[in-house]
Curated annotation (Swiss-Prot):
SUPFAM superfamilies: Ribosomal protein L25-like. Coiled coil: none annotated. This is Large ribosomal subunit protein bL25. The gene is rplY. It holds the Pfam family Ribosomal_TL5_C. GO terms for biological process: translation.
Length: 234
């Protein structure tokens, strides 16, 4: 179930670069609400509160109830821009969510049971190939993350997108379900050890074969020691 947060916003009647700079000087961040077949609405938000929400993580997958001068607008952040030098927010785009709206989001991948995976116990390393999963869901069903159980993975094995169980009401938007999510990478020297172990029986076989004739050579010598049978009388 999606987490719904609240933010307070103020209508921004003036648009343009000059008006946006004036908002930032006043400690506010310009933003816009669009979508749901309605005209866009220009707004501004308190800078400090917005920074805290962005730094908290999962900002782009969090449904927000925007309180715009007393009127609630259910939205989801679709994009935000940061100052390239000082790293503070300079603009935010919010998508208006109509009733039953379905949207595409990218959510993080969380791993489960990595400590108990056989490959990890044997010295392997968990390699996360895909850090986020693209999904399609109703606004109220957006998961905060997708959980992947890797408790059965051994060295050299992988977990694919098709192996993941999705929450109810959530669909994948990936072109292929065989996308690799996680692999267990072997430790240093593992392949050499495997080759050496595989070569040991092969090397032992010729040695065993070489000993066989020596053992068989004792048989004639034993036969030579046997007394000759007495000749029959006529």
């Amino acid at each position: 179930m999606a987490t719904v947060k609240e933010l307070k916003a103020t209508a921004r009647p003036s648009v343009g670069k000059g008006a946006a700079r004036a908002e930032r000087r006043a400690g506010r961040v310009p933003a816009v609400i669009y979508g749901d077949n309605k005209p866009p609405v220009t707004i501004s938000l308190e800078d400090r509160e917005l920074r805290l929400r962005i730094l908290a993580g999962r900002f782009l997958t969090t449904v927000v109830d925007l309180d715009l001068d007393g009127t609630k607008h259910r939205v989801i952040p679709r994009d935000f821009h940061l100052d390239p030098v000082r790293d503070f927010p300079v603009h935010v785009d919010f998508l208006r969510l109509g009733e039953g709206a379905t949207i595409r989001v990218s959510v993080p991948l969380h791993l489960k049971n990595s400590e108990t995976a056989p490959g990890v116990k044997r010295g392997g390393t968990v390699n996360i190939v895909t850090h986020t999963v693209d999904l399609e869901a109703e606004a109220d069903s957006i998961p905060q993350f997708i959980e992947a159980d890797i408790g059965t993975l051994d060295i050299g094995t992988s977990l694919h997108l098709s192996d993941v169980v999705l929450p109810k009401g959530v669909k994948l938007v990936a072109a292929r379900e065989d996308v690799t999510l996680v692999t267990i990478v072997p430790p240093s020297g593992f392949n050499e050890e495997q080759k050496a172990a595989a070569g040991a029986p092969a090397a032992a076989a010729p040695a065993a074969a070489a000993k066989a004739p020596a053992a068989g050579a004792k048989a004639p010598a034993a036969a030579a020691k046997a007394p000759a049978a007495p000749a029959k009388k006529k």
